[in-house]
Every structure is written in structure tokens, then in C-alpha cells.
Amino acid sequence: MPSLDFKRSDRVSDLIHSEVAKIFSTEVRDPRLAGITIIRVEMTPDMKKTFIYYSSSNSFSDVDKKDLLIGLSKVKGFIRSTLSKRLNMRRTPEINFKEDTSVFEE
């Protein structure tokens, strides 16, 4: 039987991706974050930090983008505490949001 070479951080990233997508679609009520799609989640090997890559279906001006970033920073704590309740992990990783620009590079 061939061994599957998956790192634990990859499996946890997939789980966090699924949960964060659910949280954004059902629990986040901030209108600044409407149209956000979670593209992928990456974790550091020590699993202390997670990077959540997002894209938005809305086209933003600089002012709107600033509001989006403010909304994301305000929802970080809520997402982390919700993940802490749902996932059986010793420590819930620090959350960092990054815009996924690869969607626009085509």
C-alpha cells in the first residue's frame, strides 16, 4: 500500500478552509465583506499562523478596499474564536488575510 505523503498542516489547512468558508457564508453579517470568496488556506509548518487567501466578486475603489480590510481585521477575532470552538486543536492559529491576486493575473 503506497504511503500518502500529506503533512498535518495541509490537512488542517483544508479543514480551516472549509470552516472559514461556512463562517463567511452563514455567520458574518458585515456588509463590507459581502461577495468574499475564500480561495485557499496555507499554514506555517508549526501551525501557529494561517494565511487565508480571498477574492471578492465586487470591484473596489481604494476607499472600498480600505473598508474591506477594516472589515476583515474586525472579523478576525470572531473567526478565530469560532474555529477554536469547532476544531479540536491545542492552539488555534493566528489568522492573516491576504488578497489572492492570482485570480486577476490571467
Regions found by a protein language model. Give the residues of each.
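Charge-rich, low-complexity N-terminal segments
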Residues: M1-K49, S55-E106
